Amino acid sequence: MNPTFILAALCLGIASATLTFNHSLEAQWTKWKAMHNRLYGMNEEGWRRAVWEKNMKMIELHNQEYSQGKHSFTMAMNTFGDMTSEEFRQVMNGFQNRKPRKGKVFQEPLFYEAPRSVDWREKGYVTPVKNQGQCGSCWAFSATGALEGQMFRKTGKLVSLSEQNLVDCSGPQGNEGCNGGLMDYAFQYVADNGGLDSEESYPYEATEESCKYNPEYSVANDTGFVDIPKQEKALMKAVATVGPISVAIDAGHESFMFYKEGIYFEPDCSSEDMDHGVLVVGYGFESTESDNSKYWLVKNSWGEEWGMGGYIKMAKDRRNHCGIASAASYPTV
């Protein structure tokens, strides 16, 4: 954690004796701490309780507005409840929005009409939701998700791949472990390395360690990657014809942090400043096929408690909302 945040926590903790709390939330606070294994020092407890109550109030207000038809999604308290939005962005969002390596460019199939909805989970392309923990390794989970899908397409076998292998070993390609990275750099590592180990043989630790790649346990490979033009129409055709696609999004908002269900639309979302790598596993629409009811089906890496069992429906065909089409790619196998 950034020393600035630690200092802020200590300073506010010293003043915690003057903080006032909503005592009607006491039982919920105690239950939340137990559920998420939170143990605080004497000076930190008051500060974290204040942050948690602020987040709880924001969530309740949002959901009241949702019931009035002002929002298209709900929010819920989760494991991030005692974190400020600044801490959250620093710890959880590790996509580095910088100029990537150049891959091949996706060629949209001529005269192809994409189906109205796609869900690659139903075809066996997608492993269960994973959890990156407090490590900025979202890029690794996005990359393994896309490669898992392409290996299933090639072999008919779905094998969970090692994010830890990427976190520990893809530094020479430009990735920085828990401090962030790019999916294209991960795909390049697999090609350069000649393989990637299974998750079973090289389990996730949520911290960067020395590289322990063992070719005996390699279960996947790629020959490079394909970048998709920065348009939702191109992304839609890629998802429909290729499989799950790695994308980057702007996830640095409290609304995303506490998303629960519904179609996510955040007015302040950027289509250029992306900070989080995720996996598009399909798309669809709710009720009528109007623009406001279309969504991308996105797999996150924050565990099953977050969102819709670890997934989020993100607004589709609304001017590249949150930059979902700005940095899309997939590995070639």
UniProtKB/Swiss-Prot annotation:
Protein name (database record): Procathepsin L
Binding site for Zn(2+) 2: 163, 199
Disulfide-linked positions: 135-178, 169-211, 269-322
Residues the entry annotates as binding Zn(2+) 1: 122
Prosegment location in residue numbers: 18-113, 289-291
Residues involved in Zn(2+) 5 binding: 250, 253
Catalytic activity annotation: Specificity close to that of papain. As compared to cathepsin B, cathepsin L exhibits higher activity toward protein substrates, but has little activity on Z-Arg-Arg-NHMec, and no peptidyl-dipeptidase activity
SUPFAM superfamilies: Cysteine proteinases (SSF54001)
Role: Thiol protease important for the overall degradation of proteins in lysosomes. Plays a critical for normal cellular functions such as general protein turnover, antigen processing and bone remodeling. Involved in the solubilization of cross-linked TG/thyroglobulin and in the subsequent release of thyroid hormone thyroxine (T4) by limited proteolysis of TG/thyroglobulin in the thyroid follicle lumen. In neuroendocrine chromaffin cells secretory vesicles, catalyzes the prohormone proenkephalin processing to the active enkephalin peptide neurotransmitter.
Residues annotated as binding Zn(2+) 6: 273
Keyword Signal annotated: yes
Gene: CTSL
Membership in a protein family: Belongs to the peptidase C1 family.
GO cellular component assignments: apical plasma membrane; chromaffin granule; extracellular space; lysosome
Alphabetic keyword roster: Cell membrane, Cytoplasmic vesicle, Disulfide bond, Hydrolase, Lysosome, Membrane, Metal-binding, Protease, Secreted, Signal, Thiol protease, Zinc, Zymogen
Alphabetized Pfam families for the sequence: Inhibitor_I29, Peptidase_C1
Compartment list: Lysosome; Apical cell membrane; Cytoplasmic vesicle, Secretory vesicle, Chromaffin granule; Secreted, Extracellular space
Ligand binding (Zn(2+) 3): 184, 227
Entry binding sites for Zn(2+) 4: 205, 209
